[in-house]
Amino acid sequence: LNIFTNNLEGLVLDHRYYAGGCSPHYIVDTRFRKPYNVESYVPETTGKYEFTMTEYNSYSNYESFVLKAKAEQSGFSFGIKIPGVFELGYSSNDNRFQKFIQRMKRFSSTSSNFIHARSELAVGVYKLKPQSLMLHYEFQQRLQQLPVEYSYGEYRELYRDYGTHYITEATVGGIYEYTLVINSQELQKAGYSLSDVQKCAQYGFNIGANIYQVYGKLGITEAGCKSLLKEIGDSTSSKRFVEDFIVLVRGGASEHITALAYRDLPTAALLQEWGDAVQYNPEIIKLKAEPLFQLVTPRDLAQAAAIKENLQRALEEFQLESSSCHCAPCQGNGIPFLRGNKCECLCPLGYSGPACETSKRTDAAVNGNWGCWSSWSSCAGGERRRRRLCKNPGPETDAGSACSGPDAETLAC
């Protein structure tokens, strides 16, 4: 796993090695043999097809809490010791993520409101043994070929081919989420609030719920909820309140993902089918990870201490090199990302060109984006420090949103 891009890279562990053992496990009714490296696999049945909903009254708030959480885990500090469980973000190369971003970014300069809904289904948790792991033969050969005298270029190639971390524990399953883009002005004219839309959607989407039996408890009339839900659930209607309905799905067979993505309002039966498909086609949704250098032991390498130290040193350089902060800003609030060692822009709908420079729109305010972190300071008082500036680009005065996240970090030393 490349923790900076969310790309799954080459195999570092041999999951076809069984050490002569035969430990049968089951996924639903499918029997499989547990590999030597796996300590445990526990089936899960959590998730009830219920949606957790959150309101955002501006695009900048939505972007800070939803979009940037999906893009990349770029805030990890040097040492890259990731604490606890975190959600696997989307790679910028993921076609699902690209389409989602392109549709969402076109609302970056509007006064729209947003409702983000999410339903998570976990089907299993697997955990690796804490030590004595069997390395994949090709990865072990690459480690043995690394020079004892530090040469960043050769260590960088290892990280490019195999990623920066290996997954020690993972929750597999599926996530169905959608975003409602609401015309705040029309909503206000009709006397509705964003909370009214959320309440109607909450009851209307949850499996087994009948909105017309509970409308009295919502503080909104039956006619009001019918009007709002019709716009969400009918892609052919002329929509006054709902500007867009954007779906993003992980896990399940491709035909079910396609069906969900092209239906405005998924039915209970379709969600159940998707859930059944997730059992046999899950994706990693949460994980724990350790840096690759933790796999370097004297058991596998004669010069283990030197190689491990070199890998740690190279990881800091690789993190700086892998960041899109080196890229020039994209226009129209496009997102810069690295494809290999080349900067590219993911443009919002309505923008095109290498830097998203071609558009007929003139209303897009420029939002701020972080520049690169500075180098770590020398150790003083048991701490090292580094800073970054919101100038890549800086936010447009009185219109663009500022960068989210801290502008300084400290590290014990």
Each PLM stretch: what is its role?
Residues L1-Q331, F337:
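Membrane-permeabilization and membrane-interfacing ectodomains
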Residues S238-F245, C327, L338-K342, P348-L349, ...:
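Thrombospondin type-1
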Residues F100-I101, C356-T358:
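A short, polar/proline- and glycine-enriched secondary-structure boundary/capping micro-motif
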